[in-house]
């Protein structure tokens, strides 16, 4: 099996719900403890309902995987309840964390005006934070993670805005972004969930939140 395959199984990928950092306008990066807001829990609830409807005629045995951050694990717990999966059997991995924003992690976006360039059309950071990761760095850790997966069952995976876009880009075999030399999928509103099976992506639910911010 190629490391970019899902072995004929479905991989349901979502970003965590809105957090207190999202709401306040702070950069999370790889910060571990940034809990969901009420809106974030509602988004997780909607994603869980949508996935349950998508699987309504099936009773698949689902694997659960998430970043090891609170916001990802909280989101996964709500979705798991809707689809009858055991959250206690979930696996977490730090390689699924958000882009490391280095010295800017935890900063307020307003305080980085003139320093952090954002491509608002594509929803991507155009500046590498001091001590932070590039999109290529994210791809390298995700490729290593993918190389260890056998995808023996359908899987629900909760990650983060930028990281999930790179993961989706890798799994759908997109051409590298000309500016960042990395496969990066299109951004989706917070609260969205997609299905990827052997390179084909299908949007299961389109959320109503904002686009990706780390």
Residue ranges of predicted features:
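Active-site-proximal alpha-helix that buttresses catalytic centers in soluble enzyme cores
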Residues: 9, 15-85, 133
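Generic beta-sheet signal
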Residues: 11, 62, 152-161
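Generic enzyme active-site microenvironment
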Residues: 14, 93, 158
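Phosphate-handling substructures
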Residues: 21, 81-141
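Conserved histidine-centered catalytic loops in small-molecule metabolism enzymes
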Residues: 56-95, 117-118, 195-214
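Active-site signature of alpha/beta-hydrolase-fold catalytic machinery across serine-
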Residues: 78, 166-170
């Amino acid at each position: 099996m190629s490391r970019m395959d899902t072995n004929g199984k479905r991989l349901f990928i979502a970003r965590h719900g809105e957090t207190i950092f999202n709401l306040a306008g702070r950069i999370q990066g790889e910060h571990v403890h940034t809990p969901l807001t009420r809106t974030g829990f509602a988004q997780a609830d909607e994603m869980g309902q949508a996935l349950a409807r998508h699987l309504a005629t099936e009773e698949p045995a689902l694997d659960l995987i998430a970043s090891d951050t609170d916001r990802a694990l909280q989101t996964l717990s709500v979705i798991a309840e809707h689809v009858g999966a055991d959250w206690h059997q979930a696996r977490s991995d730090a390689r699924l964390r958000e882009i490391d924003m280095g010295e800017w992690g935890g900063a307020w976006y307003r305080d980085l005006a003139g320093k952090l360039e954002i491509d608002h059309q594509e929803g991507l950071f155009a500046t590498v934070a001091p001590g932070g990761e590039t999109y290529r760095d994210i791809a390298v850790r995700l490729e290593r993670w993918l190389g260890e997966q056998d995808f023996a069952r359908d899987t629900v995976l909760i990650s983060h805005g930028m990281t999930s876009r790179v993961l989706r880009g890798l799994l759908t075999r997109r051409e590298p972004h000309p500016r960042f030399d990395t496969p990066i999928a299109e951004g989706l509103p917070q609260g969205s969930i997609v299905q990827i099976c052997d390179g084909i992506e299908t949007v299961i639910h389109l959320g109503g939140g904002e686009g990706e911010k780390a």
